[in-house]
A protein has these predicted regions:
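Bacterial N-terminal signal peptides that target proteins for export
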Residues: 1-8
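Glycine-rich beta-strand-turn "strand-cap" elements at beta-sheet edges
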Residues: 5, 15-26, 64-71, 100-125
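Repetitive helical segments and hydrophobic/amphipathic motifs
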Residues: 11-12
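N-terminal targeting signals for Sec/Tat export/insertion, comprising classic cleavable signal peptides
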Residues: 26-56
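An amphipathic, aromatic/His-enriched active-site/gating alpha helix that lines ligand/cofactor pockets
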Residues: 48, 52-62, 80-114
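Short glycine-/small-residue motifs
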Residues: 74
């Protein structure tokens, strides 16, 4: 009986350790202001990059861009990655680098805000 209890305890401890070993998702808000004269070209470049990232990168879980209705040159992108490693792979991808290098002159300001989701287990449907 004692050996069985020790075995159960060890199994429970191992399970708890493995749960903590999983790498957490990375969630970020990118707050961007675009120069007004470049807005149509910027929107096209961003749409191309988002489509490519979502189609080609399994670690990119969401790139959801929204433009401010009252200030259409301001946008926020909700970025969700499976892990920090997935994010690091994303920013090295050819489609992201094409977007980044092609839009540098279009961007007036960029603020990257790492955030913690209230309910990280919820999925975007």
């Amino acid at each position: 009986m004692k050996n069985m209890l020790i075995g159960i305890f060890i199994s429970m401890a191992a399970c708890a350790f493995n749960v903590g070993a999983e790498e957490a998702q990375m969630t970020r808000l990118s707050k961007i202001t675009v120069h007004a004269d470049h807005l149509p070209a910027y929107r096209a470049a961003l749409a191309e990059e988002v489509r490519a990232s979502m189609a080609l990168e399994p670690g990119v879980l969401s790139l959801y861009a929204v433009f401010d209705k009252e200030e259409p040159t301001r946008l926020t992108i909700l970025e969700i990655y499976a892990s920090r490693q997935a994010y690091e792979q994303h920013v090295k991808s050819s489609h992201f680098l094409k977007y980044k290098n092609g839009t540098l002159h279009m961007v007036k300001s960029l603020e990257l805000v790492d955030v913690d989701p209230l309910l990280p287990e919820l999925k975007i449907k």
